[in-house]
Amino acid sequence: IVAPGFKLDTAIYKAQEKYEDAKFVILDGTPNDGGENSLVADNTVSIYFAEEQSGFIAGVAAALEIGEGDFGFIGGMKIPAVQRFEIGFAEGIAYANENLGTSISLKEENVVYEGTFSNVAGGQQLAAQMYDSGVKAIFVAAGSVGIGAINEAKTQVAAGKEAWVIGVDSDQYEDGIYDVENNKSVVLTSA
């Protein structure tokens, strides 16, 4: 049984003992009792990813492609995995600025956590505010909130403005297609 995410930590904690013959994998989480006790039993594997590494590469790639201007970051919930994406992204931008001749800023007011991974409308609203303030590209580590940001980028592009998104977790290029005939997407890359 593969459990995607920290919200299933307590369920796996209970299930791994109750169903000793079953095998469990939990992604981005460690089985725990909801308190201070955690246990990865012999029938369970806990897997974490190095989000900061893909965030870094996305930051460098986006900075090289755009060259100069303001970037933004929209996170879903403020949890360690999403924070690692943010940190890596910021470090990638800084690296590109210091070593590769780019001039990208990631201002504090353009780093926002929506609070959920499901509020599509909230993601669109946050992205609209950022694009309207001059942000050129937004990294979205936010689940469905990121789909809202992608939708807003398409709206901005339809209005003749520059708007890019850096997707997360999988290749989101197709989510950002706004010109099917020419296969053009608002998704610059994905981490």
Predicted regions: what is each one?
Residues 1-191:
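A residue-level marker of the well-folded mature domains of exported/periplasmic proteins
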